[in-house]
Amino acid sequence: MITGIQITKSANDDLLNSIWLLDSETNEARCVVAKAGFEEDQVIAAADLGEYESRDVAIEVPAKVEGGQHLNVNVLKKETLEDAVAHPEKYPQLTIRVSGYAVRFNSLTTEQQKDVIARTFTSSL
């Protein structure tokens, strides 16, 4: 796990107020910023920091943008949905995807059901 710290007290003046990322899995420290003695992104053994006092620093990681698309798919025949509108008692468990979430078809109003059918089954794009 990576944690961020700012060194607030150290016998080494170069470490005072420096900011580090500590990796507990590798026991390494990566310098984020230091006034002297260390380079940005320099990696050292965490033990090489010696004795120090520190405060936690919040680490923000920007969201990773991967792109791509999302597709909701209902694998049904138009006739099945139309029959569910006419005879809801025959389809108590019929679940469809609407706007990214699952919903019981029978819980929709008749108007919503007809809208779903119209949007799902089109003659052209």
Swiss-Prot record:
Modified residues (Glycine radical): 100
InterPro entries the UniProt entry points to: Auton_GlycylRad_Cofactor (IPR050244), Form_AcTrfase_GR_CS (IPR019777), Gly_radical (IPR001150), Glycyl_radical_cofactor_GrcA (IPR011140)
GO cellular component, one term: cytosol
Domain of life: Bacteria
Keywords per UniProt: Organic radical
GO MF annotation, one: formate C-acetyltransferase activity
Residue span(s) of domain Glycine radical: 5-125
SUPFAM superfamilies named in the record: PFL-like glycyl radical enzymes (SSF51998)
Signal peptide: none
General function of this protein: Acts as a radical domain for damaged PFL and possibly other radical proteins.
Protein name: Autonomous glycyl radical cofactor
Gene, per the UniProt record: grcA
